[in-house]
Every structure is written in structure tokens, then in C-alpha cells.
């Protein structure tokens, strides 16, 4: 009989399938019951009479039938399926390393073949409600593809902690080791970073270890940690601290005396720990949702550090002011080129310098994706007005917000009225009914229908372009009453309402729009901003709806603005800002 090559489908010694399932034909035979092996391999003299029982004859017939029916493609397919299942088997090995599983005797070739034939005829491989994965496991358990006993080890790859803890004390971090073994010493790396990024390329021999240095570099889980702090000589200084696994523990252990309130700017493997007091002195506006704890809380324990991982426009402002982009770029360049080796690095640098000299580097057809909507137009194309904005101005031309005197009952029961469940949604028609119809703070309020025409307005997705157009189109609409609701990516919301010469803004932290900059650029009228604090998405939606109810009470005159501001800041996790222009 021709020997079957069970290793035909995987010839590379580096593959996990070969390492775990390098079964030769002899190993296959070693695992079979002795009665079949003795029948198949027993030397029978020519012409000799051999006494064979009926059971042996039947088993031998079944075995030969099963072997003859298996083609090379069937065996390869079986091995491929087994290989696909290896990852799961290996990943759970550590989990049950200490458990000794009972050794189960392998079924005979005939029984295995019949079981396989039965499962195939029953449609085991067909998808069903019970799941394909479970049935594939059953197939592998009953097949000849896997033999022997395996301890399932649960392997978890290294990962880096990408989130920033909100606070950490010296007592918590003193026993945490954040050091990462580096090729160069910390003193040498510090010397490099403090000498204007002087060239420091380590030389590697062409051996197996160093040939993987690029892959090792890309899979590193540590962070290059920089500390941005005050300086007695310069406005500020940026120092390289260490290459660590956790910047929070490292900072709390060794830099808590710099400032125990820290803004963290993260770019890939580089993290900048920026002093809160330094940012306050620079005059950079700190968004309410990204602010750190107050002075009283920080002063209670100087060894307890508070951290905020910044993002969006605030992150961009800090990056621009402290030139963090330059530190990131140079650090990334050097560490990446170092991992490539001297020859590749020299080639790339030569090519890049040539591209820099002939300006090709700045004219390549490469474009960074914009954060804003594709609807953004240039100044010359601003004459095109969004249909959404046009409809708002058209259908709100003849309507006004209801005008009422301040109501003591509403003011005294503001918490109950605003937090009461309602059918309010973020559709334009639903918000129009809330703002333009009499607010039913109790059942005796007469109903009206001032918002019928506004139901024709078709809402569009939010963008900076639409916000600017809405403001621009209202420049000459001094006595108009209208509003706009905008939904951005990640369910971020922005509501703007206009009553005569006053605008009311409700928003959280919006990635695509810096509301303060938009108002400063507009430079007209009076603006009241209600900015929702740092909450999750669900809470932000609830708070936005409650602020819409509060806004309706303000616009209809039922609640004085001062009382509304106090309530919003105390009960709705909101910060109020005011901008006024001539």
C-alpha cells in the first residue's frame, strides 16, 4: 500500500500546525488499536492458511474501504481544518494547564469513518442556529486529524494600557514597576533627547535576533514619556522622563512634585504629561468636559495625582502651543529608522533629502483626511446656502416663541418639570413643538399649534459649514425667532436657538466644531452657551434633552435666565459661558 504523506499540506517548520501535529504515517499507525495493526502488518507466508475470525474480517474490510475512499484532497482538507482550529486550542492551554484530562482511547478507523460519514450525511457542516463552531469542534474530536492529549494554554498577547487613570496616589504606585528593559540605558536615552535629537543609531549584526528588530519595535507596548513643566529661565521646558509601561505610575512616583494635576496628550507610543498650572498660566481655554479637579481637591493630598486624557480641539491647542508635533515627529523618525538598520535608514534618508531638495516631498498626491464634513466650501463658494438653513428661515419667518411673564410655580418646581419624562426626540419637528408651543408644565395649560409649518423642515447632518451658514443668514434677521438642531459623528449634538439679538447654544464636546471659536469669529450679538460636562454618551443625550426643556422655559419667559443658569450648573452638570459683541 502506498504510504500517505500527512505533512504534504504544511512544510514550513515555523508553522504552529507542524510543531503540534507533525504526524507521520508511522505515528498514525502507532495510535491505532492493536487488533487492526496486527491484521494489517502481520506477515503471512505465501500459500499459508491463516485463520481469521469474522469480526476481524469485517473490521479489515471497513478499514480498507475507509482508507481507499480518502483521497489526498480529503486529507489536506482535514489538516487545514485542524490548522484553523489550532489558534483556539493554543490560546486556552494555560487556562487548563493544571488539569489532567482523562486519556480517551482513539476510535478504530472503521468507527471513525462511519461516524464521519454519518455526520457528513446529516449536514453537520451546514450552518444552523446552534452555531458552526461547536459542530466543527465535534467533527475534530471524532476525526483522525488530532491525536494525543493536549493541555490547552490560554495565551494573552502583551497589550499596553491605552487609557489614563483618573487619579493615582503615591501609596498605590510605589510598588508598581514601570521600567521596561531597553537596549540603551535610560541615561543614554536621556542624553540623546537633551541634545537636540543627536543621531544615535545602534549597530546590529545581521543575525536572527536583529533581523526582527523592526517587528519588535512595531509591537512594543511601552511609552516614551515626556514631562512639560514650568521653567525658571524659559516659559516652559519639555524633558524626557523614561520609557515606561505606565505613565500614570511613573509620574506619580517620581514627578508628583511638579504638579499633581496633569493633562495627558497621547500620540501613538509617545505621551506628554503637561502641568495643569502651566496650562492655566498660558491662557489656553480648558473645556469644561476636560477640566481636572478644583484647587481644594488637589490641595488635600499633594501626593495624589489627577490625570485627564485630552482630545479634540483642546488637544490640538496644546500640541500647537508646546510644539508637541515636533517632539513626536523627531522621536518617531529616530526610533523607526533605528529599527530599520543602517543600510535601509541611509537609503531612506537619501531619498527623502532628494525629495526635499526638489520639492517633491511637498507635492506628492497625499492628503490628510479632514475632520469636517465634505460639504465645507471655500469662501468663494459660500453663496450656496444649505437647503436646511433656507427652510429654517423660510418657515420660521412668521412664528414667534410664546411670550409669558416669569412663573413662580415653574421656578419653584424646575427640577420636577425639567426631569419629567416626555416624548421629546431630536427630530426638528419634535423640538419645534417644544419651543414654539405653550410649555405644558401642568395639565391646565392651553394647547396651541404654532409649529405646524416647521414640520416641513428637513434636517441634515451637522457640519461646520452649516453652523456658519446659519449664523450668517441670521445677521440681518434681527427680530427673527428660529433654531437649528445638528447631529454630528458619534451622536454628538449641537442646538442653537435665536430670539431677536440673542443666541442660545447647547452642546457637549464636539470633535468637528469649536463653538467658542465659531462665536468669536461671528463677532455679533449676545451668545449664551450651556456646555455639558464630561459624561458618557447616554447621559449626554439625557442632559441635552433636559437642557432643551430648560431652554423652552427661558425662550417663553417662564424662567428668568439667572435662575436657569443656576439650575443648569447645579443640577444638569453644565457650565455656562457668555459672549457679547456690539
From Swiss-Prot:
Its main location: host cell. It is found in: Host nucleus. It comes from the Viruses. Homodimer. Interacts with helicase and LEF-3. Belongs to the nucleopolyhedrovirus IE-1 protein family. Regulatory transcriptional protein, which trans-activates gene expression from early baculovirus promoters. Can also trans-activate its own promoter, suggesting an autoregulation during infection of host cells. Also promotes viral DNA genome replication via the N-terminal region. This is Trans-activating transcriptional regulatory protein. It comes from Autographa californica nuclear polyhedrosis virus (AcMNPV). The lineage of its organism: Viruses, Viruses incertae sedis, Naldaviricetes, Lefavirales, Baculoviridae. The gene is IE1.
